[in-house]
Amino acid sequence: MPWNSEHTNWFFKIETNLKSKDGKEVCLLEYNYDLNDKTVLSKWAKHFRNHYCFDSEIDFLRNGTGLSRKDFLVQLKFPTEARGFGSGIRSGDFSEILVADYLEYILGYWVPRTRYGNKTIRDESTKGTDLIGFKLYDENKTTKDVLKMFEVKAQYSGNKAKPRLQDAIDDSIKDDLRKAESLNAIKQRLFDKGKTEEALKVARFQNQVDMPYTSEFGVAALYSNDIYDEDVIINCDTSAHPYNSALFLIVIKGDDMMKLVHKLFEIAADES
């Protein structure tokens, strides 16, 4: 399998009393990556690349294009580095994948990886809920099952921090309405990939009346350290969220995050 979790060892939780304006606790994490650790970066790049195109499929998909594996990824699959909205899409995709890895490998949810491989336009973000994670407890479809919908926002450049956590909170308000479409999209993509067993796991969550489970919500904001501003975080407000009591807030910050984003795309292409 292409998936790898060693890069999640670079997460460090910062003990803090950080709270939103309405008293909601905020989990603060530092992401202390190491660009000199070639082994971890290589494994991570493979993990990252396979979100866009499985290594087992790349030769078939590039057939007829006249492109090498690297050029196929750079010219047709990966968001562009500098053109138009490409850089912003790169940072958004990276941030969603990083939070998905935290959700799966640190918090113990199953997060299907279906969001990026079927993009029609590579410099656009995929519509729908950013992330959905699942906890399935047994074959009897017990009410212990959990579905967690996550919205992710990032800012890695600029002179002043924007209210990205508030933006994620506001987007999360719509997630319950988008749930049915998002679940159907995940299930269909898994089925199209021949992953019928995983598609059936998603089906367990498509009718909450007949198969009860717990719904949870999460929001994440990611910043580079040079623009991170605690005042922007503590001024966010979750009181308008209809599922406020089931809302998890997380902030991830690290040094020069956009440098890491571009480096990861570079390694993913070079080692394809």
Predicted segments with their positions:
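Nuclease-adjacent, charged terminal/linker segments that flank catalytic cores
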Residues: M1-K70, K77, F265-S272
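Charged, often glycine-rich, active-site loop that binds/positions anionic groups
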Residues: L73-L76, A82, D123-G133
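A short, highly charged nucleic-acid-interacting micro-segment common to nuclease
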Residues: F78-A100, T120-R122
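Conserved catalytic cores of phosphodiester-cleaving nucleases, focusing on short active-site segments
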Residues: L103, L131-G133, K148-A154
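A short acidic/basic microdomain associated with nuclease active sites
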Residues: I106-E124
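Short, solvent-exposed loop/turn segments that connect beta-strands within catalytic domains
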Residues: Y137-D145
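Acidic, metal/cofactor-coordinating or nucleic-acid-engaging core segments within structured domains
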Residues: G158-Y228
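Charged, structured surface patches that assemble and position nucleic-acid processing machinery
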Residues: K201-S272
